UniProtKB/Swiss-Prot annotation:
Class in the EC hierarchy, top level: translocase
GO-annotated cellular components: plasma membrane; respiratory chain complex I
Cited NCBIfam families: nuoB_fam, PRK06411.1
InterPro entries: NADH_UbQ_OxRdtase-like_20kDa, NADH_UQ_OxRdtase_20Kd_su
Reactions performed catalytically: a quinone + NADH + 5 H(+)(in) = a quinol + NAD(+) + 4 H(+)(out)
Assembly with partners or alone: NDH-1 is composed of 14 different subunits. Subunits NuoB, C, D, E, F, and G constitute the peripheral sector of the complex.
Pfam families to which the protein is assigned, alphabetical: Oxidored_q6
Record's protein name: NADH-quinone oxidoreductase subunit B
GO process terms (BP): aerobic respiration; electron transport coupled proton transport
Positions of [4Fe-4S] cluster binding: C74, C75, C139, C169
Molecular functions (GO terms): 4 iron, 4 sulfur cluster binding; iron ion binding; NADH dehydrogenase (ubiquinone) activity; NADH:ubiquinone reductase (non-electrogenic) activity; quinone binding
Length: 195
């Protein structure tokens, strides 16, 4: 007896997703969330959502931040670790770029010396607006161990405006990822058009 495949003209229909059912109500969890209910009602009535252009631009910008590495010392190792598969910063819409002209965010990680300060400013000036800076680690925040050295800038905020400070020596990859999430929250709160 040979096995022959049977073909049917009826379409295969997947069962409706149930999600996680709340045993008290018998409905999916979050089914009575007022935010999702209003979005669902608006989509059902009109077929589209209405929002302001500023909110749409802020939403798109927070989901597509491109960062440029400016690793000056040992903090750069944690910055590289943040982009590896264990933490995977790209799932938050935070992807690395090699050129300042394609970057929205610059992460200054490490000790900034007086000789390197003009190069940092030059790279910052090449970034398109709106641009953001994350200062990572004690050395970038305020000089760190080398605060009293004649050749060290006591904080990169003396050269470029800093939006987020990530403390630590070196800060962990989780701390830097939290700083990225804080930057996204700041962009949503302040906006990009006013900046």
């Amino acid at each position: 007896m040979a096995l022959t495949p049977t073909f049917s003209r009826a379409p295969d229909i997947a069962p409706a997703p149930k999600g996680i059912i709340d045993p008290a109500t018998g409905r999916p969890i979050g089914a009575n969330d007022p935010t999702f209910l209003s979005i669902n009602d608006e989509l059902a009535d009109r077929g589209f959502l209405v929002t302001s252009a500023d909110e749409l631009i802020n939403w798109a910008r927070t989901g597509s931040l491109m960062w440029m590495t400016f690793g000056l010392a040992c903090c750069a190792v944690e910055m590289m670790q943040m982009s590896m598969p264990r933490y995977d910063c790209e799932r938050f819409g935070f992807a690395p770029r090699g050129s300042p002209r394609q970057s929205d965010v610059m992460i200054v990680a490490g000790t900034l010396t007086n000789k390197m300060a003009p190069a940092l400013r030059k790279v910052y000036d090449q970034m398109p607006e709106p641009r953001y800076v994350i200062s990572m680690g004690s050395c970038a925040n305020g000089g760190g161990y080398y605060h009293y050295s004649y050749s060290v800038v006591r904080g990169c905020d003396r050269v470029v405006p800093v939006d987020i400070y990530v403390p630590g020596c070196p800060p962990s990859a989780e701390a830097l990822l939290y700083g990225v999430l804080l930057l996204q929250r700041k962009i949503r709160r302040i906006g990009t058009i006013e900046r």
